[in-house]
Amino acid sequence: MAFGSFIGRYGGFFRTRTRDNAAVAERTLQGLAQAEEATFAAMATVVEQGCEQQFQHFISNSPWRHEPVVEQIGRDAERLLGGKPTSALIIDESSFVKQGEHSVGVARQWCGRLGKVDNCQVAVFAVLTDGQRHAPVDMRLYLPQRWIEDP
């Protein structure tokens, strides 16, 4: 699905009573897809009218909720990929190496990507496949005990 088609279908999720952030959502997705690093600065260099501060605000402060977007993606994936003899739901974890300690869920824990204990975040992903195509349909960030006890 092209970015324009995606925003046409999902743009309503990025609107509030007073603001329409669909265009910013589209630029953010383009930046994530095109930049070599998933940083706001890198995204701003590869997207026309890209602005690091605007990306930061959209992700961190905009009042849109991600849950309805994820739910709609799940419904669309089920319609396209589900209900076939080859359909399957894959549940797997992935880890993200981190240098600092300020990202939610960061701790010294098993990092599958490195094959050792290191500073990272861990998330569990659900991916729907029909054997040829696949779509992520949900994810949950694992929170180590220290994050639960002292958020």
Language model segments and positions:
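Conserved, well-structured functional cores that handle cations and Mg-NTP chemistry
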Residues: 1-151
